[in-house]
Amino acid sequence: LRPDKAATLAWEERWARPVALATFASVLLIVAAIVVASQAVGGGNGESELLRDVDAHRGAQLTSSLLQAFGVGLLAAPLYYLFRAAKARSERMRGAMVGLVLVGPLFLAVLAVLSGITTLHAASDFVSSEMPRLTAKGIALGSDRADEAASDALSESPLRPLAAIFGIAGQIAFLVGMIYASLHAMRTGLLTRFWGSLGIALGALSFIFFQFTLLWFIYFGLLLVGWLPGGKPPAWASGEAEPWPTPGEKAAGELESGDSADQD
């Protein structure tokens, strides 16, 4: 092996298990955050009920936000690992794109913290104000006014604009980074066409169905530790790009094999 190729394979082997563990930990933390949040917030309707529940379970709200922040932030590890592996096998990739791969999860982690603080601040203001105290006595008659007051409390939270900035920037960076890494990993043969295409699709829809991307990350973690049937694609062991044959190339290869068998 060339020194650069040997170094690449050594780095990938050394970090495969730690990155896989970080990936699994990320998924568990995000799921735990969802569970904690669902237990803390009741099934009441409207933003007024939401803020009352949050104020009554402030510790759970803060815990959920921190769990989500750590979980989302850890997704930078598998994305960076995949990006670096593909970059080592392709001269077409732009190294500067690694910034989006790292910034996306980290900005979304900051968003989780800021959103949690924003909601806690709004809940405190809402519950301590005169309007919700009046509407709470006649909730059937004043629920609309209570929800309006709760909406105002959320929109007037001082950290809300900053959270929006990190949210938009993080979602765009995560979307582009996951698409870019999955695309080139598929082109270099590190991911099968199915999982590469799925990574691209889930990356494109991550701002709507973020939780579904966790299924793809679980697969990638299992791939890194070799717990999948068939093992890793050949490109992982060779250190070189081994693109998957197109349907036309595959059909041509099958025809050639058939002709050779007939001649024999």
What are these regions (language model features)?
Residues L1-D264:
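Hydrophobic, aromatic-enriched alpha-helical segments typical of multi-pass transmembrane helices
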